[in-house]
């Protein structure tokens, strides 16, 4: 199975900050990767598909990049509404696999 190693598992940042999280695939090529945002009690929301394509309606402060088998999600100019858990999903190889998630919290 392709393991998706996501880091960091938690992240504390201030409003206006730029934050980046990473998913690394343990193997495989041409991996199709999505990024999701999930808030407590809510269904996951698709942010980015194809590693870097922004889903319609998602603010442009979100961006995704691919570096071989490494994938990043960056949020620029962090807003209150961005505090959530983020996770990646590879859907190129069965079984499809998720990263462990990154919980983003506001720095006190």
Curated annotation (Swiss-Prot):
Cystine pairings recorded for this chain: 23-88
UniProt-annotated stretches for the region Complementarity-determining-2: 50-56
Region spans: Framework-2: 35-49
Region (Framework-4) residue spans: 98-108
Start and end residues of each stretch annotated as Complementarity-determining-1: 24-34
Annotated source species: Mus musculus (Mouse)
Gene3D superfamilies according to UniProt: Immunoglobulins (2.60.40.10)
Keywords: Adaptive immunity, Disulfide bond, Immunity, Immunoglobulin
Family annotation (Pfam families): V-set (PF07686)
GO cellular component, one term: immunoglobulin complex
Top-level taxonomy: Eukaryota, Metazoa, Chordata, Craniata, Vertebrata
Region (Framework-3): 57-88
Identification of the protein by name: Ig kappa chain V-V region EPC 109
């Amino acid at each position: 199975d392709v393991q998706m190693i996501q880091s960091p598992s938690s992240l504390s940042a201030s409003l206006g900050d730029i934050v980046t999280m990473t998913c690394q695939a343990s193997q495989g090529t041409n991996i199709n990767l999505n990024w999701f945002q999930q808030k407590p009690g809510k269904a996951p929301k698709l942010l980015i598909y194809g590693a870097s394509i922004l889903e319609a309606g998602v603010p442009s402060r979100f961006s995704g990049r691919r570096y071989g088998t490494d994938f990043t999600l960056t949020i620029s100019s962090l807003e209150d509404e961005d505090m959530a858990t983020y996770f990646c999903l590879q859907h190129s190889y069965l079984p499809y696999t998720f990263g462990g998630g990154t919980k983003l919290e506001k720095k006190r």
